[in-house]
């Protein structure tokens, strides 16, 4: 029987983006939990940290009291860092370029982030899929049939505007961004009884990389993934999969 690893992805992602990484994990199976405002949880809205925790616990009911291994990427990693404090059932935590610092540390205010996100969603519209696909090809380090299918799956056609746009609930995701601001990252000091793996992309601003590394305690296993940017598990699924398998074997999962 395949062992399941749960996955909380970043803003605007889709479960199909996990396929390449999942193929590297042998007898392990990645199961995405769609964040509020995404996928199967498109109409879900959480208003504060308490509601976020209650939503997550509801998602976890299917797993009874079994110990969980969960991966978080980007926004998903930030939220996971807090959820792990409230859900002791989560024993093994894998953070993919997330959960390491507060955006205030970069003097990036919540107001500016909300404005930037709204502008991005407004501008991320395409008259046809060919135009969108060309944009996606430029956004990723590699391109294949799976990325094509995953990219198309995260879009929807707006009949009123006659454009393709991200299939997400804008109101819900803006709430999530505000909720993230209530979390004081990192949360490692509150998770000393958990197993934690941090994977960082090689290609990023050196100042930001140094800040992330500074926030990671020496007892936490941390690796830098070559040939990868922020979309670390999409850019280099082979190396990410190898590191996850190796780490899990050392903690006897």
Language model regions located:
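Conserved alpha/beta-hydrolase catalytic His-Asp/Glu region
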Residues: 127-179
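Short beta-to-alpha linker loops that shape the active-site pocket of alpha/beta-hydrolase fold enzymes
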Residues: 34-39, 99, 228-229
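Gly/Ala-rich beta-loop-alpha elbow adjacent to hydrolase catalytic centers
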Residues: 72-76, 80
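Conserved serine/cysteine hydrolase catalytic core
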Residues: 160-216
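Catalytic histidine-centered segment of alpha/beta-hydrolase-like enzymes
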Residues: 228-237
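Flexible "cap/lid" loop of the alpha/beta hydrolase fold
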Residues: 93-127
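Active-site loop/oxyanion-hole signature of alpha/beta-hydrolase fold enzymes
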Residues: 31-71, 242
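Conserved HGGG/HGGXW glycine-rich cap/lid loop of the alpha/beta-hydrolase fold
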Residues: 2-42
